[in-house]
Amino acid sequence: MDKHARICIVGGGPAGTSMAMYLEKNGYDNYVIYEKTGRVGGKAFSPKMMVKTKDGKEEMRTIEMGAVMGCGTYFAVHECEEFGGATHADGPAMGRRFTNVDGTPLKSSKLALLKKYMKMKKLSRLLKKKYKGYDVNGHRGVAQGRYEGPCPSPEMKLAHIEGENPNLKDLCLPFSEFLKKNHCEDAELVWKGPFTSFGYGYFDEIPAAYVLKYLDAFTVAQFLSTGNLWTWKNGTESIWQGVNAHLKHPVVLNSEVTAVDRSGEKVVVTINNSQKEEFDKLILCTPLELFLKYGDPTDEEKELFSKIEHKEYFTMAVRPAEKDAPDISYYYFANMTPETRGHLMVFYHRWPDCGPQPLVTFTLRNHEGMEDIPFEEAKATTLKDMEISHLPVEKVERIDDWYYFPHVSCKDYAEGWYDKVEAMQGKKNTYYAGEVMSFGDMEETAEYSRDLVRRFFQK
């Protein structure tokens, strides 16, 4: 491809900013990134709020309203850190307590914990032996029993691999059925904490591929041992602010792409319903289903993108009374079920060296085939759950209602949705990236941007 091609990147989140970084590294620096909001980072959002230190002093510190953590397999995120000057070396230590709905500690016998650990090890061995290629970034070929893409294992460190493995077709099953098929049902408890509580859905509805590509065996082990997790003192948002600050062409903020015309040789993009710009290539790094509203979708794009679903997930920064302030994050496993959607699943206590501080609650409102819990009802339920935990909320600092985890159903996954979309890459001078093409977390999204550049924008 012509290194001077003018490239339009839609979206200034992790997908878009990392895309520009990797394009630059391959010699493509004639790009423009448009972001409709006034900041970069997308769901990596770390506003500052008042906390009290242990000696009673008030300080402004970052609070995570979206992405919270990473781990040792975040190779693409680490490349972004190095490029932009961010670091996870000084982030606050993670801690957690598994609790009953009333906030009392959830007691597990040593035997029960041992059984859970053994089930995790059993599934980890099975994945390595039977499902080679399951952890490769992206979804190309999975429904046909193939794997192709960067491998995020500690040994491979995003090296490209590809091959055939008919067993990978099992990843189209709901994760609960996948576990049942492999006699590993108890492993669900291990995977549920970092998956369902952070808004990615329930295991009876979500294809196993999403679960296991995000939470491969090594990553799950990292999540179980909180001491290995990465956090950022300046917040996850600082990663993408750093990348943006070091790009040759920083993100153009407050600039919404409101129309796209691909009828000619060039791609004509309209910004904020007024300014028109011509480009040679278009890279979509925002939800593809939204392109149906502002773009000029083909019949194939309409058919495929209309099948994308997403999760109704919101976070709230809340303050309980100072006398009630907890000293650690709480996980409520009893509330991580389809029947308890709309309830508090976890709250994040960010600063262990501080006393009273905003706690961030995480609540999921929908399940495929079930009625959505209305936002106001879920908000009231979440606040009531805090009260039941003996942490009545005195003030809600802010609420972020996220457009979360775009994905496709098990049926559409099995019918080759991803291979159909991947076959469109480059047609009409358009490329597709962002969360739905990999997974809705920082690392998977950045890995996909990295690989898209490798595939189509060679050095």
Name each region found by the language model.
Residues 43-46, 52-91:
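Conserved FAD-binding subdomain of flavin-dependent enzymes
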Residues 348-459:
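Conserved flavin/dinucleotide-binding core of flavoenzymes
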Residues 78, 82-205:
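Mobile amphipathic helical/loop "lid" adjacent to a hydrophobic cofactor/ligand pocket
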Residues 5-33:
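N-terminal Rossmann-like FAD-binding beta1-loop-alpha1 element of flavoenzymes
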Residues 24-50:
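Glycine-rich FAD pyrophosphate-binding loop
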Residues 216-266:
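Helical element adjacent to the flavin cofactor pocket in flavoenzyme catalytic cores
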Residues 15, 39, 289:
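Conserved Rossmann-like nucleotide-cofactor binding loop
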Residues 26, 258-372:
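Mid-domain catalytic core of redox enzymes
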